[in-house]
Amino acid sequence: MKIMITISENSEAKELMPIAQAVHILVNKLPVAMRSKNKPGVRLEKGEVVDTNYEGYVLKVAIEKGEVVRATPIIGPYAGLPVIVAPIKDGDNVLGAIGVVDITAGIFEDIVAISRRPELYKFLPEDAFPK
């Protein structure tokens, strides 16, 4: 049996759920939110779906800009918590966005900058080690 998951600018929460759940598990059940460009999406916390009509201001910003956004929202369920949101693209067309609460608060970037281990160079993009 072949099953295909597709995402479009008009995907609804139920269509986004399998991908959002997979990412939620990959990040050890950190809060994850995902939406399409034109419709509200889904929000997961502690292994559970907590919202299937989630707008997400920072998700909308990432969709509008078409680039990764690192921000600390001032309103909403994640107010005061740093988040990282990435657009979901098909070429230059932004279909939606997915984000996670950044419990490291940027510590990972600091650790990479401090360590600058040469053996990591072959696994990471050049911009991971700014000059």
UniProtKB/Swiss-Prot annotation:
GO terms for cellular component: plasma membrane. Keywords: Cell membrane, Membrane, Transmembrane, Transmembrane helix. Pfam families: DUF2111. It is a multi-pass membrane protein. InterPro entries: UCP006557. The chain crosses the membrane at residues 68-88, 94-114. Its main location: membrane. It is found in: Cell membrane. This is Uncharacterized protein MJ0405. It comes from Methanocaldococcus jannaschii (strain ATCC 43067 / DSM 2661 / JAL-1 / JCM 10045 / NBRC 100440) (Methanococcus jannaschii).
